[in-house]
A protein has these predicted regions:
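Ligand/cofactor pocket segment of small-molecule handling proteins
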Residues: 1
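Catalytic histidine-centered segment of alpha/beta-hydrolase-like enzymes
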Residues: 155-168
């Protein structure tokens, strides 16, 4: 989302863009995703959620690491889980994370406006079959005329952790392509 927001505002500063398994609020049928019951965390922000999660960051994130992976055994490694839990336990970290979701409605307004002017640069969209699947690729085609979409079969949201041997070559090949 951050990459799209940047490139939509400053397209002359970017040669190409990669989106990985995060939908674009305000583009196409975005509310279908935004309102999915399983994605309740999009609406979980403010003081009460902060108090509920404080001191329980690891428990909160375990749900996402496990349930958003195609196979929890090949999701985020234990050392990384410990690092993220420690990091998000720092003052202000969870609030900052929750604010991403609080701002979805404003992002939707901004992205809808950005989408009125289609990008023309090469865009690679990598998404997990058991996560966004074709949805993100379809969204990308609404905002860019030069989209290459790849659905990583049998994988979920954590593409770098679940399928590095598939993702890294895709990234390298895309980055090294000449326009």
């Amino acid at each position: 989302m951050v990459a799209y927001a940047y490139v939509a505002q400053y397209p002359s500063e970017v040669d190409r863009i990669v989106l990985m398994d995060a939908f674009l609020p305000g583009v196409g049928d975005w509310k279908t995703v935004w309102l999915l019951r399983d994605l309740w965390h999009f609406h979980f922000y403010g003081e009460t959620p902060l108090k509920l999660v404080a001191g329980r960051e690891r428990i909160y994130f375990e749900h996402f690491w496990n349930d958003f992976a195609a196979d929890p055994k090949h999701s985020v490694p234990e050392a990384d889980r410990q690092f993220y839990a420690r990091s998000y336990a720092q003052p202000g970290a969870m609030r900052a994370g929750f604010e991403v979701f609080r701002n979805f409605e404003q992002d939707a307004k901004d992205f809808a406006q950005f989408a009125e002017t289609k990008l023309t640069m090469p865009m690679l969209v990598l998404t997990g079959e058991k996560a966004s699947g074709e949805f993100l690729i379809e969204q990308a085609r609404l905002v860019d005329t030069n989209v290459e979409g790849v659905v990583i079969k049998g994988k979920g949201h954590w593409l770098m952790e679940e399928a590095p041997s598939q993702v890294i070559p895709q990234l390298v090949a895309f980055i090294n392509k000449s326009q």
